[in-house]
């Protein structure tokens, strides 16, 4: 359900609560909440939106029913999801774009390797924008997303010492893949921090 549709003349909270109870009474075992419609033109999943910005609304729905309630939107890392659950805002957390950014997100979290997770930055450019343009979905921070059968790499047949000059997005991506393939990689940049031009965003 749209737990908050942000449309003029849209559903009131009383109507949303009534709908939630009716869904439970009809026999549903789970309610998945989302926020706004595309027509509302209110950002809810863009980078500018704080993480877990709308889970408090899900918590209100949860108080109206006794079945499992799922929340979503701008929950991109395991610690954020865990905080949502600990705070009682939801019973389950829905994550989609973070899985495009890193298909091994859950595995890394379970193994205590959260620092290795390739984080979704909520740019929406290669996932949602591509989808709406009828293009193949992908991810700016993981170009292999939805192209895994075309973009393949395995261990290098011969390992090398590689110097990568430039720690912007392209340099970081190349250095990461080279290291995953077994090469010894040294990354150089004139700046004191990594990120290159992306830091301007």
Regions found by a protein language model. Name each.
Residues 1-165, 169-185, 193-199:
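Flavin-dependent oxidoreductase catalytic cores
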């Amino acid at each position: 359900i749209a737990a908050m549709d942000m449309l003029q003349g849209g559903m009131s909270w009383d109507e949303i609560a009534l709908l939630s109870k009716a869904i439970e009474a009809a026999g549903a075992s789970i309610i998945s909440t989302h926020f706004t419609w595309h027509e509302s033109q209110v950002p809810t999943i863009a980078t500018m939106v704080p993480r877990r910005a709308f889970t408090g609304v899900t918590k209100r729905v949860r108080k109206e029913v006794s079945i499992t309630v799922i929340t979503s939107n701008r929950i991109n890392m395991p610690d954020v999801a865990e905080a949502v659950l600990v705070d009682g805002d939801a019973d389950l957390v829905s994550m989609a774009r973070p899985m495009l950014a890193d298909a091994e997100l859950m595995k890394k979290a379970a193994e205590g390797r959260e620092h290795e997770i390739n984080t979704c930055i909520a740019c929406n450019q290669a996932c949602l924008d591509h989808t709406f343009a009828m293009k193949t979905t992908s991810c700016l921070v993981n170009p292999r997303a939805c192209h895994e059968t075309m973009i393949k790499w395995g261990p290098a047949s011969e390992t090398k010492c590689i110097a990568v000059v430039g720690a912007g997005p392209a340099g970081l991506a190349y250095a990461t893949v080279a290291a995953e393939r077994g090469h010894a990689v040294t990354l150089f940049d004139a700046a004191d921090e990594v990120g290159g031009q992306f830091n301007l965003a």
